[in-house]
Swiss-Prot record:
Keywords: Chromosomal rearrangement, Membrane, Signal, Transmembrane, Transmembrane helix. Belongs to the LHFP family. It is found in: Membrane. Gene3D superfamilies: 1.20.140.150. Pancreas, kidney, skeletal muscle, liver, lung brain, heart, colon, small intestine, uterus, testis, prostate, thymus, spleen and placenta. The chain crosses the membrane at residues 84-104, 123-143, 166-186. The lineage of its organism: Eukaryota, Metazoa, Chordata, Craniata, Vertebrata. This is LHFPL tetraspan subfamily member 6 protein.
Length: 200
C-alpha cells in the first residue's frame, strides 16, 4: 500500500492519534474536579457531572443521586467560564482529531500529504493544542460557582480548590494538548514526502 508519509511521518501520524485520543477522552470524562457532598464522591467535567443532589419528597431531605450525565442544557453548565471552556476545548479536540485522522489516512494513501500539507497540519495541531490549553486555563475560573462551592466547601473560589482536588481527566486533556503542540507540530514538518513533479 502506498504511503505519502516518511518514516517520521508515520510516527507523527501515530503520535497525533494518541494525543488526539488522550485529549478527547479527557475532555469527555467528567473527572476534571473531585470532591464530596453529603458524604458521597462528586466529580465535575466542563459539561458533565457525576453525583448530584436532589430533594427527596418522601424523606423531606436532600439526597445524592450517584450517576453521571451531562447538564440538561448548555445554560445549565454552572458558570460562563465553563461554558467558554467547553466550546474552546471541544474545538481544540476537534482540530486535533481532524489532523490525526488525516495523518492516519496519509499512511495508506499516496500523494495525500506533501511537505506543505504536513506543515499546515502541524500548524493546525499547534492551534488545537493552544485552544485546549486555553480551555484548561479557563477551567479554574469557574470554581467559584455555587455547585462547586457546595462540593468543595465555601472556601473555594477562582484558582482555589478548597476541599476538592484536580482529577485525572484534566491532566489527561492537558497532556494530550501539550504533546500535540510540542512533539506533533515539530514532527509534522518532516512528515510528508517531497512531491514528484511530472512533466506533462
Amino acid at each position: 500500500m502506498a504511503s505519502s508519509l516518511t518514516c517520521t511521518g508515520v510516527i507523527w501520524a501515530l503520535l497525533s492519534f494518541l494525543c488526539a485520543a488522550t485529549s478527547c477522552v479527557g475532555f469527555f470524562m467528567p473527572y476534571w474536579l473531585w470532591g464530596s457532598q453529603l458524604g458521597k464522591p462528586v466529580s465535575f467535567g466542563t459539561f458533565r457531572r457525576c453525583s448530584y443532589p436532589v430533594h427527596d419528597e418522601s424523606r423531606q431531605m436532600m439526597v445524592m443521586v450517584e450517576e453521571c450525565g451531562r447538564y440538561a442544557s448548555f445554560q445549565g453548565i454552572p458558570s460562563a467560564e465553563w461554558r467558554i471552556c467547553t466550546i474552546v476545548t471541544g474545538l481544540g479536540c476537534g482540530l486535533l482529531l481532524l489532523v490525526a485522522l488525516t495523518a492516519l489516512m496519509g499512511c495508506c494513501v499516496s500523494d495525500l500529504i506533501s511537505r506543505t500539507v504536513g506543515r499546515v497540519a502541524g500548524g493546525i495541531q499547534f492551534l488545537g493544542g493552544l485552544l485546549i490549553g486555553a480551555g484548561c486555563a479557563l477551567y479554574p475560573l469557574g470554581w467559584d460557582s455555587e455547585e462547586v462551592r457546595q462540593t468543595c466547601g465555601y472556601t473555594s473560589g477562582q484558582f482555589d480548590l478548597g476541599k476538592c482536588e484536580i482529577g485525572w481527566a484534566y491532566y489527561c486533556t492537558g497532556a494530550g494538548a501539550t504533546a500535540a503542540m510540542l512533539l506533533c507540530t515539530w514532527l509534522a514538518c518532516f512528515s510528508g514526502k517531497k512531491q514528484k513533479h511530472y512533466p506533462y
